[in-house]
Amino acid sequence: MRQVVLSPGQVFDEALLERTSAFDANALMTATQIVADVRERGDAALREYTQRFDGVDLQTFRVAPEAIEEALASCDPQVSTALQHAARQVRDFHVRQRQQSWFTVRDDGAIVGSKVEPIEAVGIYVPGGRALYPSSVLMNAIPAQVAGVKRIVCATPPTRDGSLDPAILEACRIAGVTEVYSIGGAQAIAALAYGTETIRPVSKITGPGNAYVAAAKKVVSGDVGIDMIAGPSEVCVVADESADPALVAIDLMAQAEHDPLASCYLVCFDEAYAADVLRAIDSHMQQSARAEITRASLDDKGLVVVCPNMDAAIQTVNVIAPEHLELHVAGGMDLLGQVRNAGAIFMGEWTPEAVGDYVAGPNHTLPTGGTARFSSPLSVEDFVKKSSVIQYTPLALANEGEAIMAIAEHEGLWAHAQSVRLRLGMLQDALKVDGAAAPVIDMDAQPADAQADEEVGRAELTDE
């Protein structure tokens, strides 16, 4: 791991991170070609790419219910039990994120509000390759299910024999996935976005993947929604003298073993302590089945930042804006308010990142590459959309008509202003008719679909 020692008053330079982007120009060009091909040729293109990249010739891509049942029978019971426990935790956390439709009635009878609706169909991508990720099924599908999404489609690459990991299929069952397809890579993203002869398109795609998956999500993002374009995973561990070097070392390795491009940052306060952590890494490495990947990550993307004090350490964290942040420090909760940029924050020595990856409940789909400066973890909100609701009364339009026309005319939009002017003229004409009563303004007016509460299911009517 490279090492940087900050002097008192020195500000950490983001350029020292040498971050890897989610994809490069070559990946984007390849993904663009694959997406266009699948969009044009559908299933035929999918078969060719599945043969080329996954080494298997599939005639159908949808996993049949009986095949899923067979796979479930071979799922390790201990893994199944663990996935069910994790699902309960994830669901309990995300239920608290549910949003409700709301309406408010102003003094002049105008009604404004926000109508919340689930997205109708979403696709979740679950990667294969170096590791299998049933946990990603839970983290993507459960928030969608909690949001009320009716059609949840999972795409995941097949193994060389054409099968899928039984644990992934078990996670799909637990999380309420309605369709499973044996397709991977950029071609899977294209199929989810645009559909084929046998796959209906979805409205939004979520889930991690390699550089080609990330690039494909970028390509289709103008036509369907995406969660984020995730780059290589990363962790930042802040450790003071109270932290056990062996625990800090294994937590860094837990991130490094994902991918040679994964980034691992140690922020500490003493060069001797940093040396202790590096020695502990060497000791742990002898037991790792993924030592080659782990070592490549730490050697190429690892960085130790030795800070003169805690203020400098927190400033460094906020510059890094890590996907995962571990605070192995005394009084960590007191520092929480100073941390502005982090995808997920793990507090104390008893909270390794692995608990967040699997069972704690908060989502493990997190912003990478410094995007925690402006992005958030995947949530129920990612699977709903909102419509603004507006209903004005004659009194409300009369009260605000002059303001509307003034702005519209300043912007040069004659018809905008005229649409209000005509209505105000009609209102004035009605009031001038001899013996005519003024328009009745119902101060208790509600939207035309007054049964919004029942139809939306979670609507609230509030009066401010």
Located regions from the model:
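N-terminal Rossmann-like NAD(P)+-binding subdomain of aldehyde/semialdehyde dehydrogenases
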Residues: 1-120, 443
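Alpha-helix C-terminal capping segments
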Residues: 139-150, 173-175, 193-199, 217-219, ...
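A conserved active-site cap/scaffold subdomain adjacent to cofactor or substrate pockets
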Residues: 228-300, 304
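Long, low-complexity, intrinsically disordered segments
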Residues: 442-464
